[in-house]
Regions:
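Short structural boundary motif marking the start of a folded domain
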Residues: 2-8
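Glycine-rich beta-strand-centered segment in the early N-terminal region that forms part
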Residues: 27-43, 56-105, 137-143
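Flexible, glycine-rich phosphate/dinucleotide-binding loops
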Residues: 14-16, 59, 100, 111
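Short glycine/threonine/proline-enriched tight-turn/helix- or strand-capping micro-motif at secondary-structure
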Residues: 17-27
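Cytochrome P450 core scaffold surrounding the K-helix E-X-X-R motif
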Residues: 47-54
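Short polar catalytic/cofactor-binding loops
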Residues: 11-15, 43-45
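Cysteine-cluster motifs in flexible loop/terminal segments that predominantly coordinate metals
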Residues: 85, 95-136
């Protein structure tokens, strides 16, 4: 397996400056416990990505940063403890990373999680050839969708 990949990364944001580059030697991430490695097939561009690019999110991620919240891809590696996914599974990612323990999560309002994060904002996102994602955030793509 390749050890490096291409990724579109932000190198500077805010103060009227945005530096966005295609980097060709980014290390391929390794999935940890409960995570999978995805080969990204598609990643949408949405308002959250634009706000991140413009430095208008509450917390600016460390640079360089890979944005991209709307990810679809194929599982290419599973980390320890992952039993519900296999190499070759086609998936999409729910980008709302919730704790599952706070009052909002317990009532089903995971988008209001007290410790919530957004995939591609507080974590590396999908504007790359490969991305690591929590296995619990994946949804299976039906065969009827290409």
């Amino acid at each position: 397996m390749k050890t490096t990949m291409r990724a579109v990364r932000l190198h500077e944001v805010g103060n009227g400056k945005t530096e966005l580059r295609l980097d060709k030697d980014v290390p391929v991430p390794t999935p940890g416990v409960g995570e999978v490695l995805l080969a990204v097939r598609a990643c949408g561009l949405n308002q959250v990505d634009l706000l991140t690019r413009d430095g208008q999110t509450p917390q600016t991620p460390p640079m360089p940063h890979i944005s991209g919240t709307e990810v679809a891809g194929d599982v290419v590696e599973v980390g320890p403890g992952v039993t519900q996914w296999s190499v070759g599974d086609r998936v999409v990612l729910d980008p709302i990373l919730s704790c599952g323990e706070c009052a909002s999560c317990l009532r089903g309002a995971t988008n209001m999680c007290a410790r919530g994060r957004v995939f591609g904002v507080q974590t590396p996102g999908g504007y790359a050839e490969r991305v690591v994602a929590p296995a619990k955030q994946l949804l299976r793509l039906p065969d009827s969708l290409s």
